[in-house]
Structures are given as structure tokens and as C-alpha cells.
Amino acid sequence: SIGYSFIKLNTYEDVLANFRAQLAEFNAKKLEEKGHAASFSDAEFNRIMIHMDNHSVYESAKILRDKYILQLDNGENVYLDFFSNDTDRNIYQVTHQVTMDKVHKEDVVYKNRYDVTVLINGLPMIQIELKRPGVEINEAINQINRYRKFSFKGLFRYLQLFVVSNSVQTKYFCNENEMVDGRYNPILKSLVFFWTDDKNTRINDLNTFTSEFFCKPAITEMIDKYMIIKTTEPVLMVMRPYQIYAVKAAKKRVLEVKQNGYVFACTGSGKTLTSFKLAQLLREEARVDL
């Protein structure tokens, strides 16, 4: 109902093949302008994977938001995109029960099978882990922490967000980079958030959450505008709902109402991050002179 295409992907090999096809379709116009078919040869895709593979979560998040200059077999260079803020251009897919094992990705430690994976342009971007009603939601968080440590390798390093639910409670949180020595710190429960409406009412029901959080404009905006890739340290962050609503309201006040205003919040609520993100988004507006 929210416009995603379902695709059956059983193994990491299937994930790679799908990424190859979707990335070519996503960049079809650019490829055709270079006199190239909307597909990649084995040699071209190998060059892409050399660029994409074996990076940290933090490095992968930066690659996702950047362009890659691919030398085509015909000698032309093309600037490939991996993600766009244009929902009409992105390709949204969903799959379930992907199995990661050493047979298909040698740096996997233990075999795991994932519940639901959301892919954008062929890249796994959001992982959803579901539990039965009555099962503690922290079990799903612990499960994701195990996956991060033992099997989220290769293109699964491009996961940006996680969603956990037992149908009556639903939360989201950001992926986290591994330590310098390769160890993985568990994602803190304090960094796992409920989604709310603009009146701060929690949205716990999984179906309602899905229709709001995963609608194409909302999830695209979340990844594009409301995640922070810090430059001073290898850290990824995602904003809380009230921070997002505050940024939207303040930005609207600046661009449309043209009046003064302020955002108030209590100590420890993330005012600095909210202010930073507002300034960052306003800087991207050509009509704002900062």
C-alpha cells in the first residue's frame, strides 16, 4: 500500500545481483547519455564493488551520499549516484528472510537470517526485526546487535536505520560504527526512539508506524535530511521526532512566514543538534543568505 516492490532474495549472492540491476536502472539516464546500455558488464560491476566493499559503517554512510566516477568499458566516465532525495527517482523494494553465511560472504562469522529488509536502489538501507506480541522489544535490539557483530557484512554495512517491533511497541534507531579495533559496542537503549506525531503522541502500532514512517517521502527525508554523519569523529546519528518537527517548523518560519521565532526545550533534549541541523538545511536554500 505504500508503493514498495516485493522481491525474493534468499542469499547474499541474490542481494548483489539485485543491487547490480537496480543501480543500473537508477543511473540509466546517465549511462545512456554515455552511449552505454542501462546495465553493467562484469568488469564494470567488479570496479563498483571494489569501491563499495570492505568499508566501515561510517565510511559506507559517506559513500552512500557521494558520487562515484566509474570508468565504463567504452572508455567514458560516468558519475554514479547511490541515493537521491527524489522519491520519483529512487527504487524502493522490500524483502524478507535473507540469509547471510560464510558460503556467500567469507567474513560472516555466524549464519543469520533476517526478518525484513528495505532496499533503496538495491542497497539494504533499513533492517526490521519483529517479535511476537508479549515478547520484550529489547530482544529484537539485542538480536540486531548480534547481527552487527557477526553477519552485517558487505552491502549490509550500508544499513542506515533499524526498526524493531512486537506489534504493540515499535521503535527506530540508527546504525553505529564499529570501534577502531574492530569491536562493536552494543547500541544503547537510550538511543532507541519511539516515533510520534507532531503533538508528541507515540505511534506504537506497527501498521500505523509503517504507513507514516515508511511512506516514500518520509523515509527518504529521514535518510537525506535528518541523519547526521559527523565529520569530527566516525559517528552516525538520527534525530528524535520532536527534533525533526522543530526543525521543520523553524525552517517554515524562516522561509515562508518571515517572522522571528524560537524553539524551546528542556536540558538534554538535543537543542544543539536541532540548531545545527536547522542551520545546515537553511544553508542549502539558495534564497537564504547566511
What are these regions (language model features)?
Residues 1-289:
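ATP-dependent helicase/translocase motor core
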